[in-house]
Amino acid sequence: MSPTISHKDSSRQRRPGNFSHSLDMKSGPLPPGGWDDSHLDSAGREGDREALLGDTGTGDFLKAPQSFRAELSSILLLLFLYVLQGIPLGLAGSIPLILQSKNVSYTDQAFFSFVFWPFSLKLLWAPLVDAVYVKNFGRRKSWLVPTQYILGLFMIYLSTQVDRLLGNTDDRTPDVIALTVAFFLFEFLAATQDIAVDGWALTMLSRENVGYASTCNSVGQTAGYFLGNVLFLALESADFCNKYLRFQPQPRGIVTLSDFLFFWGTVFLITTTLVALLKKENEVSVVKEETQGITDTYKLLFAIIKMPAVLTFCLLILTAKIGFSAADAVTGLKLVEEGVPKEHLALLAVPMVPLQIILPLIISKYTAGPQPLNTFYKAMPYRLLLGLEYALLVWWTPKVEHQGGFPIYYYIVVLLSYALHQVTVYSMYVSIMAFNAKVSDPLIGGTYMTLLNTVSNLGGNWPSTVALWLVDPLTVKECVGASNQNCRTPDAVELCKKLGGSCVTALDGYYVESIICVFIGFGWWFFLGPKFKKLQDEGSSSWKCKRNN
């Protein structure tokens, strides 16, 4: 299952915890509208926020104080830019559910999951975006304008091809490779736009109002993800539209993916042109630069990661989320496979929003002390056990289906399961964020936190991809109705069908994977968990980076 509305951790792409990619449940900021952890989860969102709230330096006094009302237009522009950023993220999150409804393999789903990696990796090219620009045009507009033009043009072009790529025009199987390349580019461009907008926020707003930048980011990207994921899946579904929005049933939804792409591509082109022509950049930054250029930034990152305490943290956090990977990455897709309408799963994101707002506020009371990782350690076994509960939920799903639908009590159980899961996900997420803020060297806080959060995000991305990849190899199918045949390869499946048989699943790899992941997770908790907790006992000198200026 996957969270809905992404949380931003260093890689900003989906909210912590998910059922699947769109119902995203990955362990990072989760994108709205799904059950994916993915995505807690943008390069440096938390780092940027820390910089916004930290010491601003002498540059603060170069700007006259301005009221909120005086800068309302700039705040609304930032909000809108973040909404635009959420659109391609939401669309990318909806594709796995669409593919699952077309019965693609989990190997294909694993390949498509690479689409969600750019936000976790944007630290690799963020220094380039910060350092290379056309001065007369503007430091941030030099990247924002061309990036959004490319996004808009690409969306319009893709609107003419997407039906063919999904196999809608000729009843072929979806072209997963082409879809992955297209949406990987979407995510890469959205991540680049995020870097530019984050940087522009620091100069666009005065010192008094710069704190609104993180609010614009959170609200805007969440709204954009909701539009591109939850709203799109609902309006694209003929069943949903016929049941709730129409008087006369029709064979398709109110909008198609092609229509949606064309509309938002046009919006990107028009609004980007207006920004390029009408919005000027301020030249003075509200915050002090931590580094002096590309080379300096990469040297600093390398120096940080070489520190023994940081290296230990990275190795442990990269393996900590293996135990959750089957539940986070596969569960939502399995529910769709068992017949649960994808738009219904997406809409479960809506009642989760208040919970996802309240949880961090409550949990932060327990992570504000000197040992925030204690909360991570205590929440981990509950999240692992909920992974088994998810497997039971998938097993139970076909048993309660009635006349092609599911009773209301089924959705209540799913919603309660998801809510409990979110409590554990956010407990671990807020704990990690608090620890990263606690140990980050204040002299280089933004860069330091961005690095730690990026590694935390990668720790959720790679296990999810591997979990999807292993579902098919771990699944055992038998050929029923034809003697001396098996279903181990695609050719064997075809031969079984030609001989009058059919391939029946004898053992679903998802259940095997769920059990294996829980064993691995508890192994990590017993043997490596105490070592992970001990990191918070390290002295502050263990986390301070020595660098030559």
UniProtKB/Swiss-Prot annotation:
Single GO BP term: transmembrane transport
Single GO MF descriptor: acetyl-CoA transmembrane transporter activity
Induction comment: Expression is induced in presence of ceramide.
Keywords, in A-Z order: Cataract, Deafness, Disease variant, Endoplasmic reticulum, Glycoprotein, Hereditary spastic paraplegia, Membrane, Neurodegeneration, Phosphoprotein, Transmembrane, Transmembrane helix, Transport
Outcome (variant: V400A): In a colorectal cancer sample; somatic mutation
Region of interest called Disordered, as start-end residue ranges on this chain: 1-46
Reaction catalyzed: acetyl-CoA(in) = acetyl-CoA(out)
Glycosylated residues (UniProt): N103
Disease link: Spastic paraplegia 42, autosomal dominant: A form of spastic paraplegia, a neurodegenerative disorder characterized by a slow, gradual, progressive weakness and spasticity of the lower limbs. Rate of progression and the severity of symptoms are quite variable. Initial symptoms may include difficulty with balance, weakness and stiffness in the legs, muscle spasms, and dragging the toes when walking. In some forms of the disorder, bladder symptoms (such as incontinence) may appear, or the weakness and stiffness may spread to other parts of the body.
Functional summary from the UniProt entry: Acetyl-CoA transporter that mediates active acetyl-CoA import through the endoplasmic reticulum (ER) membrane into the ER lumen where specific ER-based acetyl-CoA:lysine acetyltransferases are responsible for the acetylation of ER-based protein substrates, such as BACE1. Necessary for O-acetylation of gangliosides.
Subunit text: Homodimerizes.
Entry protein name: Acetyl-coenzyme A transporter 1
Native species: Homo sapiens
Lineage, uppermost ranks: Eukaryota, Metazoa, Chordata, Craniata, Vertebrata
